[in-house]
Amino acid sequence: MLKAQLATTIAFVMCCSSVQAETTAKATCEPTAEGSRNLVVSFYTQALIDKQVRAAFDTYVSPDFVEHKPDVPNGSRSAVVDFLEGLVTELPGARWEILRTVAEKDLVFLHARFSPAPGAPPYAIADVFRVDNCAIVEHWDVVGPPRDGMPNKNSRF
């Protein structure tokens, strides 16, 4: 059994790098709510916190990915990559921070803080990802921009 796993691993290494990255991510993913949470946190960290958008999509996101964000034309995977890479280029000092996560069945909820520049007021972000077969297949978000004079003194974070 161990020799078979080793042979399989060697065969995967000989494949192209993006296939290898995807295979590695899927091999380490557990098809559970907690496994999906770990996958989404790894994706979010690489794509937005580390600002390696394309590499994160190559590793964690299905080719058939569907985006529901209204700012992204046609909701395709390639459109999201272009949108996020443009955002990272336009706002080089931007910072994303994961505050909390919740995972249930095939859905992962992420509550995040987005600061477009050092010292800028933060946005509150709620992201929802659907995971299938250890790949992100769908995404929704709600973005709350900064507000002046908030009547509620409880923070959104």
Where are these regions (language model features)?
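Bacterial N-terminal signal peptides that target proteins for export
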Residues: 1-7
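Bacterial N-terminal signal peptides
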Residues: 7-17
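C-terminal and inter-domain tail/linker signature
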Residues: 19-157
